[in-house]
Regions:
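Short amphipathic C-terminal alpha-helix that caps PH/PH-like domains
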Residues: 100-113
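Catalytic beta-strand/loop cores that center a nucleophilic Ser/Cys/Thr
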Residues: 2-99, 117-122, 126-147
């Protein structure tokens, strides 16, 4: 049995869960749980604590029993008059060497440019600014949406 209590210097999450039929994954073959292709994505991501906001995770990161936070590394939301996909998965670095990240980015961008991209949950800019990334306050700006 693996536990952060017994192995405190290792990652404290227990895998991911997702709706593999969600249109964001139409061009990204996956199961509803972390499989081989999630290895690179998970080691190149940060889990975001979304306990206090109305985030709709596309990928739910399973927290351990000690902290039991609502975690994600990919979610969608309406913000004001707009809508967004928030990713704390690195989908920009060395994509020529990371085919899985490249394919997830491709699938998410196709989804965002489709009629299916209609997030049902509302969050505010204040909610985004309050997100915690690895226990530290994160800063977000308009520059974050550009490569």
């Amino acid at each position: 049995f693996w536990s952060p209590v017994h192995f405190p210097n290792q990652p404290a999450t227990m895998g991911v869960l997702l709706d593999e039929k969600h249109p964001a994954f139409n061009n990204f073959p996956t199961d509803s749980y972390s499989n081989w292709q999630w290895w690179d994505l998970c080691i190149n991501s940060k889990s975001i604590v979304v306990d206090a906001i109305n985030a709709k995770p596309l990928v739910s990161v399973i927290d351990n029993f000690v902290t039991n936070h609502h975690l994600t590394n990919l979610f969608e939301a309406k913000v004001g008059e707009g809508q967004l996909i928030f990713s704390s998965i690195d989908l920009t670095t060395k994509l020529s060497e990371r085919p899985v990240a490249r394919q997830l980015l491709h699938s998410v961008l196709l989804y965002m440019n489709s009629e299916n991209f209609v997030p049902s949950n509302n969050i505010t800019i204040k909610n985004l600014n309050a997100l915690k990334l690895e226990g530290k306050q994160s800063d977000f700006s308009a520059k974050d949406i550009y490569k």
